[in-house]
Amino acid sequence: MVKSITLVGSTGSIGTQTLDIVSQYPDQFRIVGLAAGSNVEMLAEQIRQFRPQIAAISAAEKLPALQAAIKDLDPQPILLGGEAGVIEVARYGDAETVVTGIVGCAGLLPTIAAIEAGKDIALANKETLIAGGPVVLPLVEKHGVKLLPADSEHSAIFQCLQGVPKGGLKKILLTASGGAFRDWDVERLAEVTVSDALKHPNWSMGRKITVDSATLMNKGLEVIEAHFLFGLDYQDIEIVIHPQSIIHSLIELQDTSVLAQLGWPDMRLPLLYALSWPERIYTDWERLNLVKAGNLTFREPDHQKYPCMQLAYAAGRAGGSMPAVLNAANEQVVALFLDEKIKFLDIPRCIELVCDRHQNDNCANPSLDDILAADQWARQEVLTATKNLASQPQIISVN
């Protein structure tokens, strides 16, 4: 039976890899809806290839260009523009599963719309749970939908948990490559350029998540996501540096057994599993050869080099609206870094300033409006914080 899929964030890294899977397995999957940010040319090509019933472009001013680019298609898909258009695509029609590939908190509202429409979620947008976990998880339960992780680490944990009885999980071990600077001395980080930060040693990803990998904020955010997905306390979720990125994460069980999921670093594998679960689909992809992979090594993360990791743990433990503030501040400050308006070491300093300013206003049981308000406040506060960085001491370590 062919599974019907809607994909939001279709022109990004997650989106294009998802469409690679759909094109490789047309007897398994079909596309109902597509939504993208601003890339008219790529979205038009995707519409021509996959013939969705509906499509949207978030940059509303580019809707006329999209309409013109596919004016010869027959039949014409429904074409929408703006954030409201993306939300409509997420809830539209008979799609069984919605893949959330939008980067950042922009994916929250489309994900909620899809859940409320009764659609299963292949979650590749970790910010949905990090910022919106207190709202999203009750909606998942209310509407009886499945929330399937589609990023490598949480997919690995999910796969390892198949067959583990309730209460059997003791600890989660999230593996991290260490990012672009895993072999750099801390002192060299003051010299980091944007080009340096975008040289990930193992994975092919978008610009924002590649910078997050370099700061290890990506792994810190994944700790918060794991807390929401699997229900463990933060003290039972650990990060370990694994430079080869062959073991994608591990779980420790109550009897001290440890289970791991292994594979080449290829995002298509967790995406395929999220789409095909509970089935396993044969692929002709390269098989893992442990002899070829060679040594698998592990080390503790350097807290001095990666202060963002500890900022994420602190925000997660604070709970409430604090993770939303952390996430929004990180998104905004990484964008400033990519635009070369701040230095690499300014990233954790700025995030810490913004989170500190939110402590007295942290909302313990936030509504969706509270989360969205905290998100917007944090983005504005980043602009103030960056102006004050010169007067703040540099972070050396966070205990």
Curated annotation (Swiss-Prot):
Belongs to the DXR family. 1-deoxy-D-xylulose 5-phosphate binds at residues 126, 152-153, 177, 200, 213, 218-219, 222. Pathway: Isoprenoid biosynthesis; isopentenyl diphosphate biosynthesis via DXP pathway; isopentenyl diphosphate from 1-deoxy-D-xylulose 5-phosphate: step 1/6. GO terms for molecular function: 1-deoxy-D-xylulose-5-phosphate reductoisomerase activity; manganese ion binding; NADPH binding. It catalyses: 2-C-methyl-D-erythritol 4-phosphate + NADP(+) = 1-deoxy-D-xylulose 5-phosphate + NADPH + H(+). This is 1-deoxy-D-xylulose 5-phosphate reductoisomerase. Its EC number is 1.1.1.267. NADPH binds at residues 11-14, 37, 39, 125, 127, 206. GO terms for biological process: isopentenyl diphosphate biosynthetic process, methylerythritol 4-phosphate pathway involved in terpenoid biosynthetic process. Catalyzes the NADPH-dependent rearrangement and reduction of 1-deoxy-D-xylulose-5-phosphate (DXP) to 2-C-methyl-D-erythritol 4-phosphate (MEP). It comes from Nostoc sp. (strain PCC 7120 / SAG 25.82 / UTEX 2576). InterPro entries: DXP_reductoisomerase, DXP_reductoisomerase_C, DXP_reductoisomerase_N, DXPR_C, DXPR_C_sf, NAD(P)-bd_dom_sf. The lineage of its organism: Bacteria, Bacillati, Cyanobacteriota, Cyanophyceae, Nostocales. It comes from the Bacteria. Keywords: Isoprene biosynthesis, Manganese, Metal-binding, NADP, Oxidoreductase. Mn(2+) binds at residues 151, 153, 222. The gene is dxr. Its cofactor is Mg(2+); Mn(2+). It is an enzyme of class 1 (oxidoreductase).
